[in-house]
């Protein structure tokens, strides 16, 4: 099924300049589909989206990273077809306003590379709505066990949509959505009590449900417990789903876990605690812990291994009530995976983190040739300079350009081989932004607000060396939230702000540039016609100056006061991002996309390895928006061609 058949969105700006009906040779060969690059990325379709708007039909599509050519950009253009007839050749963008289009029109796109027309994208029907609606199968309500296992006992619960991620589960070039269902009695790590089971669903964009995984009674529900990854880790063209599991987990076919250690463990035991530590009723403090790989098309178990890092002594994580033991993070990443030294194949690995803020650990795993194997482990114990330097999220970035990504874990950068690289020593934090925040400066930067009252409330530092570029004052109040990106054309590079920064600062200089602004401190999204990024908060998208661009009054946000979306990412259409919100009542997801015409032409952000890996981690911990490896903003340079390959 072609992606564009199901897509829809809203509002329109001005038209886009094009060359009409440029003569080309007929299709005689396909472009080299990126078979020789370094980083293994997804083989996507054109992602054509057609939307009825005032003045015609908006059409958007992908340019792939491997066909993007910054040296000779005129080498590629796109022929746009309506109802099988070519209507335009577009050379300066990847979107178009068809003023003669109607709600009955269908569209397809063919790239033209070096004068040769490539294969057809397949037809995309025109949609009238402002969004794509995906109906959901709401799980049935449940009741927790009685005393003494659960306190409060026999607690009823229903389910809410929570965080989501995407991957091409069935190899058709279209993203599927993997969605977490949380029971309404989900708990924070410092709250006792039993919870309902956590569920993972997979949906195609046409609303077809592929499968449901039930993580079982021994996986507690809450924002810090279940961090799942969706990516093609073995390069077979189908994405896998990887998540922490336990006895009681049932895969997408309804079968109990039965490979690796799960084959010999009793899968029927309920390990929930009866408060053998203070305030830990309902916690899972004993019993097996697994890491499981599930097949994308079916949700069937492919492999299960013992989870590493293991819990060990619940009191060995820096607290006395087992809360920090069960702080988890996860991301896909292109790390050093070929043995000793910083050698990287360019194939993705699985990274699972446990602990924080006192003791944190990260383990890297490979899923290759039907084998799940651990390749390295990093531990920041209390006696090391990396202790207490993490965050409630982590981000992947190749900070030294060697073809392997490092892990930015709060104030620390961890080498791609699992050794420490550098740290600012400024301590723990809840938010984290990693990208080219200062385009006039070589390399990548990190912006982070801090929760330690002994250090600066925020800092901007070099991602490779941890050299501090700018920092805030030391205050008695800590900064819990913060955002950094190029959201205004008035200042060079990224702007940044926190809950107590006193306004908006320049990431480049550290100077306060706007003391009156009060922008939201949540998510970011590339939305309208310009290069500045917009703000996403709750169920709305706004400009930096507060101008409302999109909202969904019928939708709800996730994670309480965090008010986060299900997901933001470049899911289809041109390089700009989509936002997934859940409808109030959880009956459906809505995927909103922009229909503002832009003349900025970029390849799909999902073919930027840094952005794609950060999307994989977006749903973990304290959700953070993804950042590309290059600067997007007023006066930006064309980014380099990504060194990627696809199946």
Where are the model-predicted features located?
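Long terminal accessory regions outside catalytic cores
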Residues: 50, 59-60, 109
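Beta-propeller-forming repeat regions
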Residues: 34-43, 68, 91, 97-647
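Short, ordered beta-strand-loop transition motifs
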Residues: 51-55, 90, 344
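Bacterial Sec-dependent N-terminal signal peptides
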Residues: 15-34
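Bacterial N-terminal signal peptides
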Residues: 2-14
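Structural beta-strand segments of beta-rich domains
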Residues: 46, 55-59
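Recognizes extended acidic, P/S/T-rich segments that occur
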Residues: 60-104
């Amino acid at each position: 099924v072609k992606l564009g058949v199901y897509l829809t969105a809203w509002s329109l700006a001005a038209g886009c300049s094009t060359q009409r009906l440029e003569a080309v040779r007929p299709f005689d060969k396909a472009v080299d589909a990126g078979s020789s690059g370094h980083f293994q990325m997804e083989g996507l379709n054109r992602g054509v989206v057609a939307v009825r708007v005032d003045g015609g039909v908006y059409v958007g599509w992908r340019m792939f990273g491997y066909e993007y050519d910054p040296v000779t950009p005129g080498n590629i253009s796109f022929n746009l077809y309506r109802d099988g007839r070519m209507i335009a050749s577009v050379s300066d963008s990847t979107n178009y306003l068809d003023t003669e289009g109607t709600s009955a029109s269908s569209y397809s796109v063919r790239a033209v590379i070096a004068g040769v027309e490539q294969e057809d994208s397949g037809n995309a029907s025109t949609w009238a709505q402002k969004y794509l609606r995906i109906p959901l199968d709401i799980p049935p309500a449940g009741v927790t066990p009685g005393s003494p296992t659960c306190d409060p006992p026999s607690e009823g619960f229903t389910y809410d949509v929570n965080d989501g991620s995407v991957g091409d589960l069935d190899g058709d070039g279209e993203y599927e959505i993997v969605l977490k269902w949380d029971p309404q009695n989900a708990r924070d790590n410092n709250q006792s009590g039993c919870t309902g089971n956590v569920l993972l669903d997979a949906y195609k964009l046409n609303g077809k449900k592929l499968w449901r995984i039930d993580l079982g009674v021994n996986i507690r529900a809450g924002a810090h417990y279940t961090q799942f990854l969706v990516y093609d880790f073995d390069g077979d063209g189908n994405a896998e789903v990887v998540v922490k599991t336990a006895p009681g987990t049932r895969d997408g076919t309804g079968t109990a876990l039965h490979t690796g250690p799960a084959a010999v463990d009793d899968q029927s035991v309920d390990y929930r605690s009866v408060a053998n530590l203070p305030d830990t009723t309902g916690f899972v403090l004993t019993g097996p812990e697994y890491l499981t790989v599930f097949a994308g098309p079916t949700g069937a178990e492919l492999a299960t291994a013992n989870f590493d890092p293991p819990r060990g002594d619940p009191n060995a994580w820096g607290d006395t009530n087992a809360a920090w033991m069960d702080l988890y993070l996860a991301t896909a990443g292109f790390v050093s995976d070929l043995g000793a030294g910083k050698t990287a194949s360019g194939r993705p690995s699985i990274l699972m983190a446990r602990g924080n803020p006192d003791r944190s650990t990260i383990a890297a795993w490979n899923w290759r040739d039907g084998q799940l194997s651990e390749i390295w482990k990093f531990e920041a114990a209390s006696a090391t300079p990396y202790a207490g330097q993490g965050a409630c999220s982590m981000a992947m970035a190749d900070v030294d350009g060697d073809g392997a990504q490092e892990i930015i874990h709060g104030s620390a950068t961890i080498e791609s081989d699992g050794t420490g690289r550098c740290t600012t020593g400024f301590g723990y934090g809840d938010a984290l932004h990693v990208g080219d925040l200062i385009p006039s400066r070589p390399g990548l930067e990190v912006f982070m607000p801090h929760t330690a009252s002994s250090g600066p409330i925020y800092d901007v530092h070099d991602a490779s060396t941890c050299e501090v570029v700018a920092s805030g004052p030391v205050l008695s109040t800590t900064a819990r939230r913060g955002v950094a990106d190029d959201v205004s054309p008035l200042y060079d590079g990224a702007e940044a702000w926190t809950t107590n920064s006193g306004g908006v600062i320049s990431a480049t200089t550290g100077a306060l540039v706007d003391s009156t602004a009060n922008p939201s401190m949540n998510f970011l999204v590339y939305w309208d016609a310009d290069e500045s990024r917009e703000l996403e908060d709750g169920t709305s998208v706004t400009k930096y100056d507060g101008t409302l661009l999109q909202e969904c009054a019928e939708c709800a946000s996730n994670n309480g006061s965090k008010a986060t979306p299900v997901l933001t990412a470049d899911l289809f259409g041109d390089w700009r991002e989509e936002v997934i919100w859940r409808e109030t009542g959880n009956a459906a997801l809505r995927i909103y996309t922009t229909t503002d015409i832009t003349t900025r032409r970029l390849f799909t952000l999902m073919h930027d390895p840094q952005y794609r890996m950060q999307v994989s981690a977006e749903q973990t911990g304290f959700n953070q928006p993804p950042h590309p490896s290059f600067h997007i903003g007023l006066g930006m340079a064309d980014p380099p061609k990504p060194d990627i390959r696809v199946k």
